[in-house]
Every structure is written in structure tokens, then in C-alpha cells.
């Protein structure tokens, strides 16, 4: 049986209770709660690998990397991880208001319909990619309605860089190539930049508001030809990814989607809003002040995703079958993406019913780990453990997303990255050395599959916080996180540690709610009652 080491310097009114279990099939789990004054402050679970053996390091090691829980000095523990903290979750990782009205805007934001109306009239909209304001906000307008005055406003209040969101067919027609020489491998998390352009006629240097408006008009016109543009220039076209915000929750996609919803030609103008005081990207206070002063609707990209998701469906269920597996009996669902034709599979156990509190794993394709049993990663072990846990729970869904090989770089590039790792690079450095994205996966298709299968709230099996964010806006809520901790081997030890230190992977699970009985003992309860009586 596994043990947990808690060497803590906690206040006398803080109680840490633990529970250790060894389940069938070699699945081990540990749970513990932190209780202050009878109130649950944190409840964590860690789930072990698929049995012991020589391939495991010592099940528990004292960590030199700090406390078990953030803010608790002197605590140290590791549950089959490489000196890893069991990291406390924050509210930022939880998606609330799962159902509600998809057309109802987030508090403090304008509705999508208001934004659509403003764009149709040639006015501005501010699009924000995170309701907390941690990320940027962009001024957006329709390219077909841009004029020198509006471009001058964008220059005064933005970064000075004026971009134009365009669909691939228009970029191809105008022979505008991508800026990156590796056009076939794109970082979906970043804007897809092309070479810069100016209009060939009707401008002077190309830098004035009037000149830039002329270039934008040329880009937006369906009658323009490649010879109408010169390269480089002062306008920055950005390639819109097919599927828009349902494929990538970025400003380019949001701006083009909004303009198209306004019934206009799908070409947008956008520029990042800058804080006039220090030149940094404007946060929510600055963005909302600008919106108030200039009567500009301000919208959340998450709201736009909800708006589109209510009206569109980008996956199609094409087959369902009974699927007996080594883990148990499941149902297999094959979904085809309407964006690129890729077939994805989901397996389900039990009755999803009302879709509440479903155990879910969204798993990225890894041929080397899942099929060939590669020891370089933990993918195969995580898949195995997730299927076991769903079978044991009797109810759950695993979505297997194709096209995620090597965190989105593809099989061949992943093998090249392996060679670099053998030469001393870690998994992040290897991708960077190849000129590739560290992680270009997106989870919108997986979210739509879950919605179609009836899932509404879930306990998500993951160590990766990006999956929480990737589900936002699809009418799904994450009510808890179940970590998927797999055996450490000599081959994957550095890989797992790099994911923790450089990619933000976390361990442990913060589940809000009342204190469960299994974490309490009579002394705790009596002490709490005595304290309450004193205050009464």
C-alpha cells in the first residue's frame, strides 16, 4: 500500500486528514483534505499507476521543490511523480454556468447581437479573449466599411499595427504567402501571419491612415488581383482558420466570425488596444473605459463560441458500435469533423443520463505511446488508467482525438524531436529547435463530441490545465479534476518533469463542496462544534 508523507508547518487550527486505498487491478489512490475550523479548504485526490514493479521509482519521495500545497511552507510529498508538488487548483480552471442561455453575455459584456449590429453599421467592437482581462482586447471592424477616420482611431488607441483577418481562399486568390517558411506546420495557439502588403496604386508611403485604409479596401474587394498589391507593406494580413472560434478561440477568428454574422464580406480589421499610460496591453479596466467613452460594444470570445455553438454543429456522428475491450464492455462512437474530415472516436460506459458529473477523459492521439507502448511518454499508461477508471466507475466517456500526435506536430516531426531529446534537449526545447509549436492542440472538436453525447458537467481526468480552458464556451462545466498519474520510468522521467516545470501540468484535485465524512474524525467534529458554541 502506498504511503503519503506530510511534513507540515500548519497552524494549530488546520487539520490534514488522509485516506489511502488500494483498489482492484492494482489501481492505487490517495485522498486528503485540509480543514480549517471545520470548513473544507481543499480536497485532493491522486491516482496511482497500474501496479508496482521495477519500473516505478519509490512510490513516495520527499520533494526538494517546495510544499505539497501552495502556501503551506515545509510540506513535501510526491505521489509517483518526479519531485512534483500536488498543486492546489484555482477557480480560474473551473468553467461555470454550464447551461444557462448561450445568448446571455458574460456579466459586464455586451451581447453578440449588439456587436453584430454595431459592425453592420460600420462601428467598432472590442473583442476580449479572456473575461478576466488577463489576455488582450482588440478593436475590430468590418474591412469593407473601413475609412481613414476609423483607421486613425485604431492607430491612436492600438499598437500601431493594423491587421486584416482573411479567409484562406482570399489569401490564395491574392497570392499572399504565409510569413513562416514552415507553412505546413502551424502553431494553432498563435496568429497565422502572412507577408505584409500595401496597395500598389492610390497611396504614397503606405503608412498614413488614408493609405492603410486604401490597402484594406483592396484586400477586402472580391475584384482585387495579386498585381494590385506590393510586398512588403504596412498592413498585416492574418489567415483565418476554417471553423473560426469553434476551431481556434483567437482574435482573428473572432473578428471574421463577427463580421460574417453581420452579413458582410468576411474580412475584418483588428488592432490590439494599448494602455496609454505605460504602453502595455490594455487590461479590462482600460478596455471598459474605452468602450464607455466611445460607445463601443465589448464582447467575450467565449460568448461568441457559445453563440456559434448554439447555432452550428461541426461534428457528425457516423457510426455507433458495441465494443468489448480488455477493460470491459463499452460503446464506440465515430464522429467526423465537418472542418477537415478527420474521424475521431469516443467510447462510453453506462448511461450518460442527465449528463451531470460524468467521468471524462479527452485523450490526444499518440501512436507510439498508445499502440507501440513507447516508454518515452506517459500517454499509453494514461489511456490505460483512464479506461480502467471509467470501467470501474460504471459511467464515463473517453474522447480520442486524432491529429494530436506529438502535441499537434505530427508523427514524423515527433520522431525528429526524439532524436534531439537523445542529444540532450527536453521535450519543449526539441520542438522549439525544430521551429515548431510547443503545444498546438485544440479541444473544440472534443468539446462538441462531449456535448453531442449528452455530457454537461464532468470530472475531467487530466494533469493539463489547458484542457479546462479549451472547453470553455461549449456549454460544458468542469466540476472536478481527477489527476492521471502514471508510472515513472528512466525513459520518461525528464519528460514528465518538463511538463510540470515548463508546461504547467499540475497534480492533485481541488473539488469544492462540503467536507465529506471520510475525511472527518470525531475529534474534528467535536472540536468544530465546541468552537461554534463558543461563538454563539
Curated annotation (Swiss-Prot):
Residue ranges for the region (GTP cyclohydrolase II) are: 311-536
Residues of the region (Inactive DHBP synthase) are: 44-310
Q: Specify the species.
A: Oryza sativa subsp. japonica
The annotated regions of Acidic residues compositional bias extend over: 525-536
Please tell me where D-ribulose 5-phosphate binds in this chain: 133-134, 138, 248-252
UniProt region (Disordered), positions on chain = 507-536
Give the keywords, sorted.
Answer: Chloroplast, GTP-binding, Hydrolase, Metal-binding, Nucleotide-binding, Plastid, Riboflavin biosynthesis, Transit peptide, Zinc
Q: Which GO terms describe its molecular function?
A: 3,4-dihydroxy-2-butanone-4-phosphate synthase activity; GTP binding; GTP cyclohydrolase II activity; metal ion binding
Quote the EC number. 3.5.4.25
Q: Which positions does UniProt annotate for Zn(2+) binding?
A: 366, 377, 379
Q: Where in the cell is it found?
A: Plastid, Chloroplast
Per UniProt, the cofactor note for this protein states: Binds 1 zinc ion per subunit.
This chain's protein is named Probable monofunctional riboflavin biosynthesis protein RIBA 3, chloroplastic
Cofactor(s) required, per the database record: Zn(2+)
Query: By its UniProt entry, which InterPro entries does this protein fall under?
Result: DHBP_synth_RibB-like_a/b_dom (IPR017945), DHBP_synthase_RibB (IPR000422), GTP_cyclohydro_II (IPR032677), RibA (IPR000926), RibA-like_sf (IPR036144), Riboflavin_synth_RibBA (IPR016299)
Please name the GO terms of the biological process aspect recorded for this protein, alphabetically: riboflavin biosynthetic process
Question: According to the lineage, what is the superkingdom?
Answer: Eukaryota
Q: Which GO terms describe its cellular component?
A: chloroplast; cytosol
- UniProt lists the gene as RIBA3
What reaction is this protein's catalytic activity?
A: GTP + 4 H2O = 2,5-diamino-6-hydroxy-4-(5-phosphoribosylamino)-pyrimidine + formate + 2 phosphate + 3 H(+)
Q: Which family does it belong to?
A: In the N-terminal section; belongs to the DHBP synthase family.
Amino acid at each position: 500500500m502506498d504511503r503519503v508523507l506530510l511534513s507540515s508547518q500548519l497552524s494549530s487550527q488546520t487539520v490534514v486528514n488522509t485516506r489511502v486505498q488500494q483498489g482492484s487491478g492494482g489501481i492505487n489512490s490517495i485522498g486528503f483534505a485540509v480543514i480549517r475550523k471545520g470548513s473544507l479548504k481543499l480536497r485532493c485526490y491522486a491516482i496511482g499507476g497500474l501496479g508496482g514493479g521495477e519500473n516505478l521509482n519509490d512510490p513516495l519521495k520527499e520533494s526538494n521543490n517546495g510544499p505539497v500545497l501552495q502556501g503551506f511552507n515545509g510540506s513535501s510529498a510526491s505521489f509517483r511523480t518526479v519531485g512534483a508538488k500536488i498543486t492546489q487548483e484555482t477557480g480560474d480552471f473551473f468553467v461555470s454556468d454550464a447551461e444557462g442561455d448561450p445568448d446571455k453575455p458574460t456579466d459586464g459584456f455586451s451581447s453578440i447581437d449588439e456587436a453584430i449590429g454595431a459592425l453592420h453599421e460600420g462601428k467598432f467592437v472590442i473583442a476580449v479573449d479572456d473575461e478576466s482581462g488577463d489576455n488582450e482586447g482588440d478593436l475590430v471592424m468590418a474591412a469593407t466599411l473601413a475609412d481613414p477616420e476609423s483607421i486613425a482611431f485604431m492607430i491612436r488607441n492600438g499598437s500601431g499595427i493594423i491587421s486584416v483577418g482573411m479567409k484562406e481562399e482570399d489569401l490564395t486568390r491574392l497570392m499572399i504567402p504565409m510569413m513562416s517558411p514552415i507553412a505546413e506546420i502551424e502553431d494553432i495557439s498563435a496568429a497565422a501571419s502572412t507577408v505584409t502588403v500595401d496597395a500598389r496604386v492610390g497611396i504614397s508611403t503606405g503608412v498614413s491612415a488614408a493609405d492603410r485604409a486604401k490597402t484594406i479596401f483592396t484586400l477586402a474587394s472580391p475584384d482585387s488581383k495579386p498585381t494590385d498589391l506590393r510586398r512588403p507593406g504596412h498592413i498585416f494580413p492574418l489567415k483565418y482558420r476554417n471553423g473560426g472560434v469553434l476551431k481556434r478561440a483567437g482574435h482573428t477568428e473572432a473578428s471574421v466570425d463577427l463580421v460574417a454574422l453581420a452579413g458582410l464580406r468576411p474580412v475584418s480589421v483588428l488592432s490590439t488596444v494599448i494602455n496609454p499610460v505605460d504602453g502595455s496591453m490594455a487590461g479590462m479596466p482600460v478596455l471598459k473605459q474605452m468602450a464607455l467613452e466611445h460607445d463601443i460594444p465589448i464582447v467575450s470570445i467565449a460568448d461568441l463560441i457559445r453563440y456559434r455553438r448554439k447555432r452550428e454543429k461541426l461534428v457528425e456522428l457516423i457510426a455507433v458500435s458495441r465494443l468489448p475491450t480488455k477493460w470491459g464492455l463499452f460503446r464506440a462512437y465515430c464522429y467526423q469533423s465537418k472542418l477537415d474530415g478527420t474521424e475521431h472516436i469516443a467510447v462510453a460506459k453506462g448511461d450518460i443520463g442527465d449528463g451531470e458529473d460524468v467521468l471524462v477523459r479527452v485523450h490526444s492521439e499518440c501512436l507510439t505511446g498508445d499502440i507501440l507502448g513507447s516508454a518515452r511518454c506517459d500517454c499509453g499508461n494514461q489511456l490505460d488508467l483512464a479506461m480502467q477508471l471509467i470501467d470501474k466507475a460504471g459511467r464515463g466517456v473517453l474522447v480520442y482525438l486524432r491529429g494530436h500526435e506529438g502535441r499537434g506536430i505530427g508523427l514524423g516531426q515527433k520522431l525528429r524531436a526524439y532524436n534531439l531529446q537523445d542529444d540532450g534537449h527536453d521535450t519543449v526545447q526539441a520542438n522549439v529547435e525544430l521551429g515548431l509549436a510547443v503545444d498546438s492542440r485544440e479541444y473544440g472538436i472534443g468539446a462538441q463530441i462531449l456535448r453531442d453525447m449528452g455530457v454537461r458537467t464532468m470530472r475531467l481526468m487530466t494533469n493539463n490545465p489547458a484542457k479546462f480552458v479549451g472547453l470553455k464556451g461549449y456549454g460544458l462545466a468542469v466540476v472536478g479534476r481527477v489527476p492521471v498519474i502514471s508510472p515513472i520510468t528512466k525513459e520518461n522521467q525528464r519528460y514528465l518533469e518538463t511538463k510540470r516545470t515548463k508546461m504547467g501540468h499540475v497534480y492533485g484535485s481541488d473539488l469544492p463542496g462540503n467536507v465529506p465524512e471520510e475525511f472527518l474524525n470525531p475529534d474534528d467534529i467535536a472540536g468544530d462544534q465546541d468552537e461554534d458554541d463558543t461563538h454563539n
